[in-house]
Amino acid sequence: MSGESGFKNKSISEIVKEIYENIDGMTMSGKKDGNSNIGGFIATRHKEWYDKASIVNIIYEGYVTYGGMTGRDMGAMAQGLNESMDFEYLKSRCKQVEYLANKLDKYGVPFQRPFGEHALFIDAKKILGHIPIDDLIAQTLAIEIYLEGGVGSVEIGTLLADRDPITQEN
């Protein structure tokens, strides 16, 4: 793992704190970044952004006054966030992604480069180009990976991008 020289002697939590001090807003999934089983959050410094997000949030979580996570789940996320600040843990995650990238390279599986320290994105269209877009190529690949190897993945493709609001096409 490499990084910026100005952060070489800072802890992960010091780096994260500095990043958060310089942002206007963020989203976070607890399942990935928070090392917990459920939840996530939206944070912003801007009241107008908060108000807009709160309206959209109703669709997915309910009103901000009663929807959302249980106390147990918030505690699990808090614990997961603390554990995620451990350098050895983060190094291990990065090594896992690097290991996967090396295996995919060995077998000629196309993926986006450079790969991240958080995830690796397989190019489903290159693998399953014979499948029509409307049949959700990335979703199909995610399902097949699970059926074949028991590995859970997520599609970041046609389904996630939603349909064009005018044409209703993917």
From Swiss-Prot:
| Any GO BP annotation | amino acid metabolic process
Please give the cofactor(s) recorded in the UniProt entry for this protein.
Answer: pyridoxal 5'-phosphate
Name the coiled-coil region(s). Answer: none
Question: Which residues does the record list as N6-(pyridoxal phosphate)lysine (modified residue)?
Answer: 32
What are the entry keywords? Pyridoxal phosphate
Give the Gene Ontology MF terms in alphabetical order: lyase activity
Superkingdom: Eukaryota
Report the family membership.
Belongs to the beta-eliminating lyase family.
Name the record gives this protein: Putative beta-eliminating lyase-like protein
Q: Could you tell me which species this protein originates from?
A: Dictyostelium discoideum
